[in-house]
Amino acid sequence: MSIFSSLYVAMSGIRSNEVGMGIIGDNIANMNTIGFKGSRGVFSDILNTTIMGEPGLSEVGQGSMATSVQRLVGQGALLQTGVSTDLAIGGNGFFMMKGQVSGTDATFYSRNGQFRIDEDGFLANMGGLQLLGFPASLTTGEVGTNIAPLQVGTQISPPKATNNVTLDVNLDPKEPQLGPGATLDTTDESTMASTSSFSTTTTWYDSLGEAHDVDLYYIHQQSGEWSWHAVVDQGELDPALAGNFQEVGTGTLTFTSDGLLDTYTPPPPGPSLTIQFDGASSQDVTFDWGDAITTDAVAGIAGSGVGTSSYATKSAVVTVSQDGFGAGDLTFIDFDRDGTIHGTFSNGDQRTLGRVAMANFLSPDQLNAVGGNSFLESPGSGEPAVGEPNTGGRGMIFNSSLEQSNVDLSNEFTNMIVTQRGFQASSRTVTTADQMLTELINLKR
């Protein structure tokens, strides 16, 4: 190798170490970038001349060169954020997103799970790329098989008409007995109050999600026997009749000498009453008064008497609940490990909204980086194996968490020192070769 050749060899070392330092600098700059995967330089030697000698084959090197940059796709640490739309992948795989990056409209892949619900209701990252997944039917909650952008923010929980009312009431046996066959006078509120022993108000929902007040009046007929009467303002049934009252259902309640619920009518399995509110569909409503000893036994159920009671204490409502609700807006979303998205609505309803899709690659380190912490598939990466999280070698989803960069700062500083020394040594080779050339030129003097 000539002195001139040593200059070029040294320059190749300088260039290689420059590339290496650039890679290290990029890793350090992105040590706090969510989902970032560090890289390392791949270098090789350069051969210019092969000399065949008696002892064997030897090669004269011409320095080094950077041949490629290899992405290190190891797992990063998970950071809990408390933000419900933040997602992290534990294991292999990438989030799939649809949109544009640098003018390219395609499906992109990323480990950055910083998502939000955008103005159109889509789960999207901060760059506007929409998260892909398997949307679910809002009516059935069944997750589909077609991949599409997950639009969850615009979903509305449809209303449900009241069909079951559960009551736990205590009716004071010391209330005056109004006599067998006593009825409720629905002329007005004052007559209903004077012809009953106790009353309470419940709220029911019709098929359109409209709320209606239904009053329940109780009459102490005789010892151990009460009647109940469901009353509504007729304006709830026909606006033209507002101000008038109508009894829409009635039945009886009997109690044992211990104050336990013995029987009630109408008995199951039929409804307690049928009602049709204005503009809505007709609905059957069944009252559950508790475990009636005799009534439930006839229906094949072990009756314990627990529920509505008649104890010597003030008449009062213990609990009242019903299964209807109005339409509701989405207020909160949550994710399971398999990527299933659950929505909680303002009406208390909870529904499955879909499932996050994930893609895995045979050679994920060969994906093409396009900026924004996103990648495109390449011939080297292979085609994406798309499916549900936690299946087919794909990792699990951790909600309210983010995957941190997998850059190890201590390793990067170590590599920086080694690279710096390599750069200095190559520079010294240039200086030394220059001195040798100077000496060679001075031989002529």
State each model region's role:
Residues 1-40, 45:
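N-terminal intrinsically disordered, low-complexity, charge/repeat-rich segments that act as generic
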Residues 37-407, 411-415, 422:
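Small/polar low-complexity and glycine-rich loop motifs
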Residues 436-445:
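Structured functional modules or segments
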Residues 14-17, 21, 409, 416, ...:
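Amphipathic alpha-helical coiled-coil segments
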